[in-house]
A protein has these predicted regions:
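Insoluble glucan recognition modules
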Residues: 1-187
Length: 187
C-alpha cells in the first residue's frame, strides 16, 4: 500500500562547506614570522566574528613589536600611542612578549585586547609528565588549525588550555570523543 503526504515547498540555499571568515586585516611586526613587511610572507590574518567591526587573530609571537594593518600595506595601519589598549591610526608599535595570543580588535570602540591563549598536551606519556609545562600546540593562522609535533611514550595524556586545569579535555569511554574534564587518554 502506497502512502502519500501533503506537498511542502522548501527553499534550499547551497553554501560552501568551508566557511570563509578571512579579512584583509593582519598583524605585522618584528614579533611575527614576516617581520616588518617581508614581501614573501603575508601578515598574520584576522578573522571576522559575529560582532560587526570586531575581528580576532590567534598568533604565536616572539619578543618584539607589532602593529595591525590592512591589505599587507602601510596606507592603513594601527598601533597604540599610549600602551592603553586604544587603537590609534598610524600609532606607535605595540611591544609584546613571546607567546601565543588571542588578539581582538574592535573598530567600533577603537580598542584591542591581547590575552594568552594556548593549548597543550600534558601527562605521563609526555617528556614533562603531569607537572608540565605542557607540550604546546602552535596555531597555524594560514590554515586555521592547531598543531603539535610531540613524541609520546607509554602512559596517559590530557589536553588543556593555558597550562591550567580550569579547562581540560579527556576521553570518557575511550571512544575518540573528547569531553570536558574527561578521563585520561591512554597512549
Amino acid at each position: 500500500q502506497e502512502i502519500y503526504s501533503n506537498t511542502v515547498n522548501i527553499t534550499v540555499t547551497p553554501y560552501s562547506s568551508l566557511l570563509d571568515l578571512s579579512t584583509s586585516l593582519g598583524v605585522v611586526g618584528s614579533a611575527t614570522p614576516g617581520g616588518w613587511g617581508n614581501e614573501n610572507i603575508l601578515d598574520l590574518p584576522f578573522y571576522t566574528t559575529a560582532t560587526t567591526n570586531v575581528y580576532v587573530a590567534y598568533v604565536t609571537l616572539r619578543n618584539g613589536e607589532i602593529k595591525f594593518r590592512n591589505n599587507n600595506d602601510w596606507s592603513e595601519n594601527w598601533g597604540d600611542d599610549g600602551a592603553d589598549g586604544t587603537l590609534d591610526s598610524y600609532g606607535a608599535n605595540i611591544a609584546v612578549s613571546a607567546g601565543t595570543y588571542k588578539i581582538e580588535v574592535n573598530f567600533s570602540s577603537m580598542t584591542y585586547t591581547m590575552e594568552e591563549y594556548s593549548w597543550g598536551i600534558v601527562g605521563s606519556a609526555t617528556t614533562n609528565g603531569w607537572g608540565g609545562p605542557d607540550m604546546m600546540f602552535h596555531y597555524n593562522s594560514f590554515q586555521d588549525d592547531w598543531r603539535a609535533v610531540v613524541t609520546l611514550g607509554d602512559g596517559e595524556v590530557k589536553f588543556r588550555f593555558n597550562n591550567d586545569w580550569g579547562v581540560n579535555y579527556g576521553d570518557d569511554g575511550a571512544d575518540g570523543t573528547m569531553e570536558a574534564n574527561g578521563a585520561n587518554i591512554a597512549v
